Regions:
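Conserved alpha/beta-hydrolase "acid-adjacent" motif
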Residues: 195-200, 224
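Active-site nucleophile elbow and catalytic-triad environment of alpha/beta-hydrolase enzymes
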Residues: 162-178
Length: 234
């Protein structure tokens, strides 16, 4: 299993396929979905990291969670692999990390796809905001994937949730000026019943200079990039 030492973190990542590089960024408390890599690998060299405290990457207890730090870890991994520039595809939290990379490292991103991602915490629906603010880590059942993959063990689940909660309850906080700094052509995908407010998705679409907005009918938060993302990227 490949790991890279980046920013004091022993980061797990997977690489499959040939072609132009594409960085896949998973959602919160997850790893990259198994079917995701084979979908893109026939066309791209897919690089799929797992962020701190998630998937097969251990938690660093002394370092708080912030989307910006995840973005910097991802850029450091790209540098470690000799990847100067890549398409970036992110789901949920991964899309937020992708936005951060595109804002602060525009030269690194050739194209950007986000699904179910917000630019501001207030872009979540009121119900989602309330859930994230009142999340009780001790009452959330351990995800099977976390228990199976985490080097920290299943007992660390409430600990890492408690550490993630301040980020989830307050971030991201990108301004329209931040979004206007994105140079890469961008595809924003949301479900019409997503946790992202539809009006917020429109605000993001208007603020990002080279953006397209795709609203998937009869879809909730579980929409993963598919054919619409692939046609946009190639």
């Amino acid at each position: 299993m490949p790991y890279a030492e980046v920013n004091g973190l022993n980061m797990y990542y997977d690489v499959q396929g040939d072609g132009e590089p594409l960085v896949l960024l998973h959602g919160g408390m997850a790893s990259v979905p198994e079917r995701w890599i084979p979908f893109f690998a026939p066309r791209f060299r897919v690089i799929a990291p797992e962020q701190m405290g998630q998937g097969r990457t251990a938690d660093l207890g002394e370092r708080p969670f912030h989307y910006h730090d995840m973005a910097e870890d991802t850029v450091a991994l790209m540098r470690h692999l000799g990847v100067e520039r890549a398409a970036v595809v992110g789901y949920s939290d991964g899309g937020i990390v992708g936005l951060d990379i595109a804002i602060h490292h525009p030269q690194r991103v050739s194209k950007l796809v986000t699904t179910g991602s917000t630019a501001r915490f207030e872009g979540n629906t009121p119900e989602t905001q309330e859930f994230l603010r009142t999340l009780d880590p001790t009452s959330e059942p351990v995800w099977d994937e976390y228990a199976e993959l985490s080097p920290d063990g299943a007992d660390h689940w409430p600990v890492v949730l408690e550490r993630l909660k301040p980020m989830w309850a307050a971030e991201p906080n990108f301004s329209d000026e931040d979004l206007r700094a994105i140079e890469a052509p961008t595809l924003l995908i949301i479900g019409d019943r997503d946790i992202v407010k539809p009006e917020h998705a429109v605000e993001m679409f208007r603020a990002i200079r080279h953006a397209r907005l795709c609203v998937v009918p009869d879809a909730e938060h579980g929409v993963l990039p598919g054919d619409e993302a692939l046609s946009f990227l190639v």
